[in-house]
Amino acid sequence: MDIASTESVSAAAGEAEKLTPCIDLIINNATTASADTMKELPEFNLDLIAPAVDVGAVGPIRVMKAFLPLLKKSPIGALVVNISSEAGSIGKCYRTFYLDYGTEKAALNMLTMTVRNYIKDDPNLNIICIHPGWIRTNPANTEAPLDPYEHAETLRRLFETKRHDKDGPVFVTHTGEPYPW
């Protein structure tokens, strides 16, 4: 599935409908990375921002829209989790780089909140965005404090508590604490 293509996402949803009567959980973890991500404004190629936002912010909402009929059929309540980042927090912004990635994640946060407002009266559907923390996912980040296997269990428990939590915060850390927009 090409998350940047509405046609591709719609086709994937159509295939899923042939295979299952419902979906209980969607985790959107799409992002882009470019050689310019770590560059500051004078060296940054601004043409990279729009594609980053299309993949990392619009893409997850594209997925939710296409899969909405299957999500609404969940017998246990469906949850959509959008993987954001502290880089998308405007209130915590300290960097002079990440012009593409930070913009993408800030846009994802806004779109998540807008969709949350739309589904607020649906007791069977919820959406959150999460800053997952720094995880040891490859040999390049051995200093990361979070073990991926332990972290997966922590996130599973968090997702279960957030499935029906319409009153709690929408942008949270991997421990469920509110994170500044």
Predicted regions and their residues:
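A glycine-rich helix->loop->beta "capping" turn
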Residues: 15-28, 34-37, 45
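Flexible, glycine-rich beta-alpha linker
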Residues: 88-90, 120-143
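Rossmann-like NAD(H)/NADP(H) cofactor-binding core
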Residues: 79-81, 126-128, 170
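Catalytic loop of short-chain dehydrogenase/reductase
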Residues: 32-34, 39-53, 58-61, 72-121
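Short-chain dehydrogenase/reductase
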Residues: 13, 64, 112, 152-155
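Active-site loop/turn elements of alpha/beta-hydrolase fold enzymes
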Residues: 3, 30, 85, 132, ...
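C-terminal helical subdomain
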Residues: 129-132, 141-181
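The beta1-alpha1 cofactor-binding region of Rossmann-like NAD(H)/NADP(H)-dependent oxidoreductases
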Residues: 1-11
